[in-house]
Amino acid sequence: MVPPVYIVSTARTPIGSFQGTLSSLTYSDLGAHAVKAALNKVPQIKPEDVDEIVFGGVLQANVGQAPARQVALKAGLTDKIVASTVNKVCASGLKAIIIGAQNIICGTSDIVVVGGAESMTNTPYYLPTARNGARFGDSTLIDGIQKDGLLDVYEQKLMGVAAEKCAADHGFTREQQDEFAIKSYQKAGNALKQGKFNQEIAPVTIKGVRGKPDVVVEKDEEIEKFNEAKLKSARAVFQKENGTVTGPNASKINDGAAALILVSEAKLKELGLKPLAKINGWGEAARNPIDFTIAPALAVPKAVKHAGLTLDQVDFFELNEAFSVVGLANAEICQIPLEKLNAYGGAVALGHPLGCSGARIVVTLLSVLIQEGGKIGCAGVCNGGGGASSIVIEKVDSDFKL
């Protein structure tokens, strides 16, 4: 029997818009804030108790050596902590959770901080010719966000081109994608108004400059930018003729971080910790890189099977909305009822900080299970290169006893 792994705390930053309210914060600033907030919820865990941190991060240029290590030390963890940074593109944060759980199961760690972060705003441009010297003519700047985050390296096509292929392959219209996006914004807006994100978001204080007061950021920045008329009239971005994917019906470029604290059963008993959820299983898969959009349709069933369940036993699903068509296509293939999917909206409305999102969807999934009466939840996220990662968690009841 596989030893259980428990989630005892979660936290995330609000998600900031590109060059928005969180733009002054670095990858490590964002990550450390989420980690501190998660640890503050479990005072029984002291900094010296944490064995390891596994943290996702995609756009690592100019971030500095060992980004996860920076997060750990900035969050106040000891210099003895083992730190690993994961780059599995959009699935990085979820892969970090899987690795943390595996290390606990293997007996090499008892308490692991996991999650991910991204400051897409602070990603630099590259000047490749500068290394050897530009001898003659113009030199071209390379956008780091596009090069390392949003471009299929094999076909040299943007991720949105793959989304257009997915829409064509599966027969999803522009109108269907717009409707999915509108519902994502509506669900996120309702969740915001009802305080559904309060237990997961740790407000961030941005220091005022030149005599200006500090600003407290406590909600996701994108949600309130929703304009249905503009969404429906937006031009297709990636395909001129008969294009269906637009800026508004796709995820956004964002900044943010999310963190979770995982513990073994032995450490749960020793410290008298109250678990929020148990990790029941996970699954990963890959296919042709240009079809990464539907890789979750392979990974999700594997995760559910690994957990010893069937898809109809899952109460709520979180699928990262890289594009509206990703949610639509994977839900159709896996026969997931849309009322079970992304109950509080998804990346279209909330934002998609690349290295953070895989962890963020698990944090939000747990919020949904707790507040909407669910027991079993499954999260899945596709990633550039053709892959996907998925995880199944089970909410622990308030009367839980070992």
Curated annotation (Swiss-Prot):
Q: In which pathway does it act?
A: Metabolic intermediate biosynthesis; (R)-mevalonate biosynthesis; (R)-mevalonate from acetyl-CoA: step 1/3
Catalytic site positions: 90 (acyl-thioester intermediate), 352 (proton acceptor), 382 (proton acceptor)
Q: Which residues bind CoA?
A: 185, 230, 251
Return the GO cellular component terms, semicolon-separated: cytosol; mitochondrion
Expression induction per the record is:
Expression is up-regulated in azole resistant clinical isolates. Expression is induced by exposure to arole antifungals such as fluconazole, ketoconazole or itraconazole.
Binding-site list for K(+): 185, 250, 348
A Pfam family name for this chain?
Thiolase_C
Q: Which GO terms describe its molecular function?
A: acetyl-CoA C-acetyltransferase activity; metal ion binding
Statement: the UniProt record of this protein carries the keyword Zinc: no
Q: Which CDD domains match?
A: thiolase (cd00751)
Keyword Cytoplasm attributed:
yes
Reported EC number(s) for this entry are 2.3.1.9
Q: Which domain of life is it from?
A: Eukaryota
Keywords from the UniProt entry: Acyltransferase, Cytoplasm, Lipid biosynthesis, Lipid metabolism, Metal-binding, Potassium, Steroid biosynthesis, Transferase
Please state the protein's primary subcellular location.
Answer: cytoplasm
Q: What does this protein do?
A: Acetyl-CoA acetyltransferase; part of the first module of ergosterol biosynthesis pathway that includes the early steps of the pathway, conserved across all eukaryotes, and which results in the formation of mevalonate from acetyl-coenzyme A (acetyl-CoA). ERG10 catalyzes the formation of acetoacetyl-CoA from acetyl-CoA. The first module starts with the action of the cytosolic acetyl-CoA acetyltransferase ERG10 that catalyzes the formation of acetoacetyl-CoA. The hydroxymethylglutaryl-CoA synthase ERG13 then condenses acetyl-CoA with acetoacetyl-CoA to form HMG-CoA.
Quaternary state and interactors:
Homotetramer.
Q: Which family does it belong to?
A: Belongs to the thiolase-like superfamily. Thiolase family.
Q: What is this protein called?
A: Acetyl-CoA acetyltransferase
Q: Which organism is it from?
A: Candida albicans (strain SC5314 / ATCC MYA-2876) (Yeast)
